[in-house]
């Protein structure tokens, strides 16, 4: 096959930091022969405190960089960018664009039986109402109960994945959501899959957790098949990682998110 065939081109995944590596991990497991290129804007994280105009400008810069790498698909693995900048990305991109919010919302609608869905995420994501809007577009009858969980991201990055402090914090955050008798809980932050076992334990066995990273991987597999973009080669894929800064403990945190060693990371300037 011609090396310029679109099927052989990489999937481009981007985030403001390291959280999107949970999406890369899910893609590696779901699509083991796909080449993947990851971009983390680690010099300018967090995006949540930035203006809408700034986030859109950053998203356009990243999109242009990834398109120069000849990606066949763009995945917005950052909830903040997905909530604010998807239209900016789509307006620039000649290739398909997917995002974690849409994937998580679709999975939640498919899974809920009582039309009562909880959503947890960072304050920025929750305040944007992006998940609620996406779910309501798909199923207007759904009752949605959202909860901002400001402390979970730093606890994950500290590595306290099953720490008593993390468990107590999760219990406090989930209490009002669980009181609404939801049957489905969306993990609306790419850090949260690392807390999946703890959150399931706190929520109880009757609550279905929607892992937006897994949902994103499934949506990607479906799109590649429909658009005939699946890589037909059965050889070890190439993974490339780009960042705008290599902050303290980046390697350690990145490997925790990816679930394997993080190969050579290249620092770039936009």
Curated annotation (Swiss-Prot):
Give the gene symbol: murI
Keyword Zinc among record annotations: no
Annotated substrate binding lies at 15-16, 47-48, 79-80, 190-191
User: What protein is this chain from?
Assistant: Glutamate racemase
Which InterPro entries does the entry link to?
Asp/Glu/hydantoin_racemase (IPR015942), Asp/Glu_race (IPR001920), Asp/Glu_racemase_AS_2 (IPR033134), Glu_race (IPR004391)
Pathway field of the UniProt record reads: Cell wall biogenesis; peptidoglycan biosynthesis
Q: Which family does it belong to?
A: Belongs to the aspartate/glutamate racemases family.
The task this protein performs is described as:
Provides the (R)-glutamate required for cell wall biosynthesis.
Q: This protein's superkingdom?
A: Bacteria
Q: Which GO terms describe its biological process?
A: cell wall organization; peptidoglycan biosynthetic process; regulation of cell shape
Lineage summary: Bacteria, Pseudomonadati, Thermodesulfobacteriota, Syntrophia, Syntrophales
EC no. given is 5.1.1.3
């Amino acid at each position: 096959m011609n090396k310029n065939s679109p099927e052989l081109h990489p999937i481009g995944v981007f985030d403001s930091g390291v959280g999107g590596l949970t999406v890369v991990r899910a893609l590696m497991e779901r699509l083991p022969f796909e080449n993947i290129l990851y971009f983390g804007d680690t010099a300018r994280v967090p995006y949540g405190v930035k203006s809408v105009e700034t986030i859109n400008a950053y998203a356009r810069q990243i999109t242009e960089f990834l398109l120069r790498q000849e990606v066949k698909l763009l995945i917005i693995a950052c909830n903040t960018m997905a909530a604010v900048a998807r239209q900016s990305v789509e307006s620039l991109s000649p290739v398909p664009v997917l995002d974690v919010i849409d994937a998580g919302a679709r999975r939640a609608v498919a899974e809920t039986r009582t039309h009562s869905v909880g959503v947890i995420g960072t304050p920025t994501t929750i305040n944007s109402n992006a998940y609620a809007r996406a779910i309501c577009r798909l199923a207007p009858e759904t009752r949605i109960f959202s909860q901002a969980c400001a402390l979970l991201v730093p606890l994950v990055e500290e590595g306290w994945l099953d720490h008593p402090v993390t468990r107590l914090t999760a219990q406090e955050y989930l209490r009002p959501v669980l009181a609404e008798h939801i049957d489905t809980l969306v993990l609306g932050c790419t850090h949260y899959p690392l807390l999946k076992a703890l959150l399931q334990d706190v929520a109880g066995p009757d609550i279905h957790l929607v892992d937006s990273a897994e949902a994103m991987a499934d949506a990607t597999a479906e799109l590649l098949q429909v658009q005939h973009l699946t890589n037909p080669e059965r050889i070890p894929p190439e993974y490339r990682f780009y960042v705008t800064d290599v902050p303290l403990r980046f390697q350690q945190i990145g490997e925790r998110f990816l679930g394997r060693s993080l190969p050579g990371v290249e620092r770039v300037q936009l």
